[in-house]
Amino acid sequence: MNNFPEDHPFNESNFKQNPFNVFDFGGYEHEGATLIPFDDLKDLRLPITQLRELNEAEAANIARAYEIWEMRRRKPNFADLLTIGYARELHRNSFVTIWDWAGMLRTKMTNIGVQPYLIQSQLRQLLDNTKYQLELVMQGSGLDLDSSREERLLYILGEFAYKLVWIHPFQNGNGRWSRLYADQLADVIKVSRFSWGKSIENIPARRNEMLRALRIADSTGDISAYLSWAKK
């Protein structure tokens, strides 16, 4: 159990009841009582020291971001979502109470992700390419004989989520942010959201399967395993 007050939005009892599939895994491989890396502590806005507490706080924040999106009566079109400004705004609004740098593009190397100087151009290219592909399918083009319209749209969204993680635009929170982003696009273009491995009830197993799928995609360029996991 975490140590937040009962009425605090990060208190475990408040966010365990949330219906959204976002309380699965954080950005660190080892959690539990493991301490947050020292270099990350200086950027935290919360009085926490353990990765478990950080994971809980990030999960609560992203759940709130889902709730805000659900309550939004007039959704923007997909072109308005696919901008660097919106990408940064979504991350900032999701994690602003946790990290000083929420919404700010990464400026130092991490163990995954492109070089910091490439983030802006790679992210813009991905956003523009995703917009172009969605436009083609929405207009009735961009389909092949072996896939339906929805299958093609889901492939585009799955590839989008995977490449967001691959670019790793932010210091932390990229996984949850990428899934929220893809879910918002799914709502706007009116296709079913991915379940993001929810059928795998064992959370460590769910996370491990996702990591295996990401490694396969990284090494081969084939996102089939990632799409299969995302649909479970």
Question: What does each model-found stretch correspond to?
Answer:
Residues M1-K232:
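FIC/Doc superfamily catalytic core
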